Amino acid sequence: MTEYRNFLLLFITSLSVIYPCTGISWLGLTINGSSVGWNQTHHCKLLDGLVPDQQQLCKRNLELMHSIVRAARLTKSACTSSFSDMRWNWSSIESAPHFTPDLAKGTREAAFVVSLAAAVVSHAIARACASGDLPSCSCAAMPSEQAAPDFRWGGCGDNLRYYGLQMGSAFSDAPMRNRRSGPQDFRLMQLHNNAVGRQVLMDSLEMKCKCHGVSGSCSVKTCWKGLQDISTISADLKSKYLSATKVIPRQIGTRRQLVPREMEVRPVGENELVYLVSSPDYCTQNAKQGSLGTTDRQCNKTASGSESCGLMCCGRGYNAYTEVLVERCQCKYHWCCYVSCKTCKRTVERYVSK
Amino acid sequence: MGSLSRQAFFQELGSGCLLPTVQQGLEQVWQLLLICLVCRLSWRLGLPNFLKHLSTVVGGFYTLYLFFELHMVWVVLLSLLCYLILFLCRHSSSRGPFLSITILIYLLLGELHMMDTTTWHKMRGSQMVVAMKAVSLAFDLDKGIVDKVPSPVEFMGYIYFVGTVIFGPWISFNSYMDAVESRKLSVSWFMKSVISCVKSQLCLLISNCVAPYLFPYFIPVFGNKLLRKWLQAYENSLSFHFSNYFVSFLGETTTTLAGAGFTEEKDNLKWDMTIAKPLYVEFPRSMVEVVTSWNLPMSRWLNTYVFRKALRYGSFTAIIMTYTASALLHGLSFHIGAVLLTLGFITYIEHVLRKRLSAILNACVLSKRCPSDCKHRHKKELWVYLINGTFSMLALLHLTYLGSDFRPQDGVASHTIQKWTQLSWTSHWLTFALWVFYRLIL
């Protein structure tokens, strides 16, 4: 059995090398996607990031592309801020549409980026829809399922459910429905993680409700869409990343499914990120594993978590240097309506890994 | 990638919060307003009083059903129980106390046994108004202010008066009977209704869409960790305040629209019902002023039927009993009980301290504003303003502290304790310090 697994793993690795992952290749749109006007169908073929199905989607929905380019940009910045305290160097995401092995293989890091990208693209489309930038969508109809008997529907807040998720799903899932994108197990993993990302997005956009009544009773309840940041979604997915489950493929009946590698008695949860390949420790530079190492990475001497110098530097120690910061201070608000600040200089000590 | 930019925030706020809030605010109350108006118009038709009472009972039942559906039976049961007690004790002179105890038992049983918290919580406002009406009627009968037990249809008309049955406020039985006389339709009546309605929607918007995002979007104050806790507490507090004003102005609207809520002096009719005074709460002189300005009819009720009757046991006891009664009317919520009891101590200590300072300094520094002809020597000196200003700031801090955790649906005790711990029990400590100071200057 162990030999079979080893063989299978080797086989998957070989296939991954032969067919580079294109599930999130569209993140490469940030490179030159913003310089294109997206008003002619031939623009869809100019860029590297799109697979054939996505090109078709692009041609039929040119107006979506601005949102998708924006989503690619947002995904990269959210990824950057989420992982600044981790050893894994997120800069490899900048090489999209061609990825180094840390993202090209079915690693935990790839699971995070894939799910985040799926969430952000749906979010961006939904917001464009809500703001009226997309002529092809309109205010959502009254949902058939009522949240509660006294729940009243309020406005266009729910464009996410019907248009953002649908179009976002069509776009981000498209590469994985193509057999040439990689082995089936890899595609199943990506599709699962895409779904997790969208679910996190859905959960974060719950309605906020408030009660009004005599002395705080609940005679009248008003509900509205809560304002959400991408950083909220990103933080949620990061915690799922930290508790992600390693899976192996298994034939169950006529279908191939992913099941947890360790405890083989339970199915994979719908809210769990999954990965196929274990990650290196990212301490030293190793091109084969896509590890850039932590040398010269900034760390926090006083912290105790993953950003601490002890963990970030993998025990190699760190160097200290000073930096002069120029920042705004003594800000005052002037009625109405602007803020004026003075400029101050502050010297801080920084630490980087050896 | 931080929070939304300011411009993006305001765009999001408009479509995501302002619009849905107004839409839902009107959607849920337009039928109530319509029924109030129909009731008012029908009373102008010259119907016999019997039919007038009956029409408002029908309107009241319908609005109760609109808001609470079948759960309205609990309100109906309470009113039937009240009438039964009044009828059975019609020859007694202690109807007030007896009815009060009966209602208390009913409310406690309801709270503890009869149904799930969410449903009971929804109706609590209406139950409270019914209880207050019945108790006031009983005491007024004892004192002869109302000369005989009203007929069933009169009683039910009073209890289910469509103008006050959902959002209050409490009005006396005599006020209701005055309303049944049905004053002429007039521009000032209509304008009062419209203006109160507009005010209520404005307060709803502030409660939902402005207060929760006050810092740093509306007012660019960022602050350090400690200050941010207080800023957030202030936001929660403000949101709760404006929710109360929304309900108060809505109550003004429905009451006026239904034909009550006026004062009459020598043929001069004024549609001047006032339930809450927002400016006196948001820019308070003292906590005493805050407490009375929060809900004027309720203040009047508590003063008339609880405080004055308890005064024979001493002013401190009377104050505590008043706040206890208020807490019980609000239901068995640890949070509300804790807030009201704390409020009771705060107001009492502030009151006696300022009274003492006023005597020692011979200055206008009482909890309530001095009339212009008071005999204090010092009225407009700078240090008088400073003392009053200090107490105002204290009141603002108390309000922020007490209102920092109003999520009425979860009555978990530990949450209140936790929130007050986060704010270092500041108001409690300050109140204690003021009490020590008061004892020192006795």
Swiss-Prot record, chain A:
Protein name according to UniProt: Protein Wnt-11
* UniProt modification remark: Palmitoleoylation is required for efficient binding to frizzled receptors. Depalmitoleoylation leads to Wnt signaling pathway inhibition.
Answer whether the UniProt record assigns the keyword Endoplasmic reticulum to this protein: no
Provide the disulphide bond pattern: 129-137, 139-156, 209-223, 211-218, 283-314, 299-309, 329-344, 331-341, 336-337
Family to which the UniProt record says this protein belongs: Belongs to the Wnt family.
Write the record's keywords in alphabetical order, separated by commas.
Answer: Developmental protein, Disulfide bond, Extracellular matrix, Glycoprotein, Lipoprotein, Secreted, Signal, Wnt signaling pathway
Q: Where is the protein situated, by its record's location annotation?
A: Secreted, Extracellular space, Extracellular matrix
> Which biological process annotations from GO are given for this protein?
camera-type eye development; canonical Wnt signaling pathway; cell fate commitment; cell migration; cell migration involved in gastrulation; cell-cell adhesion; central nervous system development; convergent extension
- Residues annotated as glycosylated: 32, 39, 89, 300
Q: Which SMART domains match?
A: WNT1
Task of the protein: Ligand for fzd5, a member of the G-protein coupled frizzled receptor family. Plays a role in early eye development, possibly through wnt non-canonical signaling. Promotes eye formation, at least partially, by antagonizing the Wnt/beta-catenin pathway. In addition, promotes coherence of eye field cells, potentially contributing to the coordinated morphogenetic behaviors of cells in the nascent eye field.
**Where does the record place the O-palmitoleoyl serine lipid attachment?**
215
Q: What's an example GO cellular component term for this entry?
A: cytoplasm
In its UniProt record, a GO molecular function of this protein is: cytokine activity
* Annotated signal sequence range: 1-23
The organism sits in which domain of life?
Eukaryota
